[in-house]
């Protein structure tokens, strides 16, 4: 399970992906790729923040590149990239469904030719109900003040992109300090309405003795997670965690020490674990509704309340499923981690002096088993190995000091790490650790969100709240929007991935400069299928009113006419184009979220006419009335973008979300006929709310699931 993820394994998996989806994406006949048939098991599909920041437009057909060695080499590199493989699995479900004669899709996933099939750790979950009434969305209380965080994402592990499973799970960080009653990180399974038992169920929850404010990433098989936490003192820490499922509801046998009236002590013949603390327990002499207070061994524990009667040795004790607080983990040494049995974790403190991390999420490279992450002092840290079975370690002290100000989340495209800083510069770092610094593209607060990289087109995008437009002329687009006054703009910056220190950038202006953070947008399905489409972004007016913006783009660059020129251009900028304002989403100042896109054409191919959704949220004062979210509220909205949106396009659905949402992730595009309650989105609220499926504990920050089609 912990083998090194070798280049051979990844290349093998990528090679097999050409069987099937290559026919659709590249035009290369499957018959040319002599690969043996696959075994019937499947390897799962992780989805975390990194899959929203490293993307791949259509790389073209085999015939288009076969006679050009350089183009062919790039074509192969793209097809061997794990995230390209996973992207194609999600967008071409008809092939992943494996029609007769095609290879099974498990080999389209990471390490498929080498890594063994993986099964959930812990007791199996029950299968789906034969018949079920759709329950709609769920929301679970993660604790007072708990949230994934603005611009941060939960992480989802699916065992298939075309068939939902009740063992699929989603992981949320909580952004509050862990304790015996508060999880630092929590996962839910039994996600879909047609699963039996409690929907959802707490799969596992851990107190890691720190605060996790940053997006988590998943290992290839989903059996480990990695994240950065802030401990009570000292530098930020990279945490590697092997999880184990909370014990299922079960019946244990009372041991030799009977339940005694007035005593809290009880024993069993076997079967207790530390994760039973807080679980419900019932039996003769145990007060109704009592819980387990402590577990001292596999056979001994204490009740929360004194027994009110006497039990007998050998009688049954019922333990409630999925109840109880988080399991508190104590970190093992780095050298002990590869061999430890879950649940266990290890920590690696960032090297350097006073190294904190407030906005940089770890980026995992599947091929080399490496994590890259930035810190608040401009250091770029590299950890290798991490999940692969040998002692995890940091490389360098740190690996590269690229800046002196806070770094964004880094994005690695297979050859270079791209990262922004709070001073408004982009950096490209090669494999030897040499950093290339761009021209300045943004003023304070610089580049907060990680770059968006289209590896196929060779473009890197930065979304900035205040560009480097301080010398705007009175004829600039932002001046026109600001009563003729000179002012900075907010917008999207584009540079080639091979930029140098003097390379000029292009910009698509999305509004007057704002104090809001401008998070990354998302390409629509038109861009993926035709190479000509749009980026949708949640930008803002100068008064901090979030607005949905449509940025016309091709694989060659921004595609609208220039709207700023001559002396009005920002320093080091070659062209400025203006995005289309679709609709202002609030009536008063509020904050926005990243934009997430999904083409959901069921088990059919995504074409330019397929149903395409985008999702984004506002933190309050929403002015777009929908069935699920009346005006005046903080709302998450969705639009169907099968064709480009026109001005004032109304959202197709909305849902109340206290103070807005974190980044939004997608599970699958499974038709309702295969498993009711699939094809969902996942996020957290950014403030306490009413978490409708959490019983009486329902007033904290909510982990939410909602439908893609109607947000219900």
Positions of predicted regions on the chain:
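Residue-level detector of intrinsically disordered/flexible regions characterized by low predicted structural confidence
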Residues: 9, 34, 307-308, 312, ...
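Generic low-polarity alpha-helical segments
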Residues: 1, 27-28, 281, 288-294, ...
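Bacterial N-terminal signal peptides that target proteins for export
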Residues: 2-12
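Bacterial N-terminal signal peptides
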Residues: 11-22
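Mobile, glycine-rich extracellular loop/lid and propeptide segments
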Residues: 52, 75, 102-250, 321-566, ...
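Small/polar beta-strand repeat architecture
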Residues: 250-322
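Intrinsically disordered, low-structural-confidence terminal and linker regions
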Residues: 21-124
């Amino acid at each position: 399970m912990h083998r090194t993820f070798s280049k051979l394994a990844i290349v093998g998996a990528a090679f097999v992906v050409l069987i099937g989806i290559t026919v659709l994406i590249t035009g290369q006949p499957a018959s040319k790729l002599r690969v043996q048939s696959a075994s019937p098991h499947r390897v799962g599909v992780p989805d975390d923040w990194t899959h929203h920041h490293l993307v791949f437009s259509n790389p073209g057909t085999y015939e288009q590149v076969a006679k050009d060695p350089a183009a062919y080499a790039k074509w192969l590199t793209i097809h061997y990239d794990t995230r390209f493989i996973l992207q194609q699995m999600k967008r071409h479900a008809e092939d992943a469904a494996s029609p007769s004669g095609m290879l099974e899709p498990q080999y389209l996933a990471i390490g498929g030719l080498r890594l063994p099939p993986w099964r959930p750790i812990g007791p199996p979950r029950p299968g789906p109900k034969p018949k079920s009434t759709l329950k709609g969305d769920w929301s679970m209380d993660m604790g007072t003040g708990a949230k994934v965080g603005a611009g941060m994402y939960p992480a989802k592990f699916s065992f298939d992109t075309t068939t939902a499973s009740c063992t699929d799970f989603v992981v949320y960080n909580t952004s509050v300090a862990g304790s015996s009653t508060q999880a630092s990180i929590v996962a839910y399974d039994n996600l879909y309405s047609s699963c039996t038992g409690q929907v959802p169920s707490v799969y596992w929850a851990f107190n890691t003795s720190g605060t996790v404010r940053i997006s988590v990433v998943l290992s290839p098989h989903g059996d480990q997670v990695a994240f950065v936490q802030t401990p009570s003192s000292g530098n930020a820490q990279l945490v590697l965690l092997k999880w184990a499922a909370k014990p299922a509801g079960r019946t244990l046998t009372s041991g030799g020490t009977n339940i005694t009236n007035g005593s809290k002590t009880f024993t069993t013949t076997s079967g207790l674990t530390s994760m039973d603390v807080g679980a419900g327990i019932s039996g003769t002499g145990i007060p109704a509704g009592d819980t387990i207070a402590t577990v001292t061994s596999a056979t001994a524990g204490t009740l929360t309340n004194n027994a009110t009667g006497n039990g007998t040795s050998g009688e049954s004790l019922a333990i409630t499923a999925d109840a109880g607080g988080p399991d508190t983990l104590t970190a093992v040494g780095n050298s002990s981690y590869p061999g430890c049995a879950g649940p266990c974790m290890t920590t690696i403190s960032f090297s350097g002096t006073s190294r904190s991390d407030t906005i940089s999420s770890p980026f995992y490279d599947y091929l080399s088993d490496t994590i890259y992450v930035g810190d608040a002092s401009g250091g770029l840290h590299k950890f290798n190995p991490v999940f692969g079975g040998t002692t995890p370690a940091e490389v360098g002290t740190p690996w590269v000091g690229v800046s002196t100000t806070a770094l964004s989340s880094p994005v690695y495209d297979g050859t270079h790490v791209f990262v922004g800083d709070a001073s408004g510069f982009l950096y490209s770092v090669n494999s030897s650790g040499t950093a290339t610094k761009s021209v300045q593209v943004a003023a304070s607060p610089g580049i907060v969100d990680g770059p968006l990289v289209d590896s196929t087109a060779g473009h890197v995008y930065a979304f900035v709240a205040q560009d480097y437009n301080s010398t705007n002329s009175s004829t600039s687009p932002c001046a026109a929007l600001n009563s003729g006054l000179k002012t900075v703009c907010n917008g999207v910056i584009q540079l080639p991935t091979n930029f140098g220190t003097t390379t000029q950038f292009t910009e698509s202006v999305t509004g007057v400069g704002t104090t809001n953070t401008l998070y990354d947008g998302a390409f629509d399905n038109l861009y993926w299928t035709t190479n000509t489409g749009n980026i949708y972004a949640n930008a803002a007016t100068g008064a901090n009113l979030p607005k949905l913006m449509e940025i016309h783009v091709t694989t060659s660059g921004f595609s609208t006419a220039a709207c700023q020129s001559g002396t009005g251009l920002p320093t080091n900028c070659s062209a400025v184009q203006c995005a289309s304002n679709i609709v202002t989403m609030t009536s008063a100042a509020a904050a926005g979220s990243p934009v997430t896109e999904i083409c959901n054409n069921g088990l059919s191919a995504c074409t330019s006419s397929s149903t395409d959704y985008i999702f984004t949220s506002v933190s309050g004062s929403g002015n777009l009335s929908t069935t699920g979210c009346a005006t005046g509220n903080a709302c998450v909205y969705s639009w169907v973008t099968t064709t480009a949106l026109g001005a004032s396009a109304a959202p197709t659905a909305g849902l109340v979300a206290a103070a807005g949402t974190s980044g939004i992730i997608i599970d699958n595009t499974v038709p309702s006929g295969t498993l009711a309650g699939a094809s969902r989105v996942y996020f957290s609220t950014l403030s306490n709310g009413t978490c409708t499926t959490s019983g009486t504990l329902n007033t904290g920050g909510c982990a939410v699931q909602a439908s893609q089609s109607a947000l219900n």
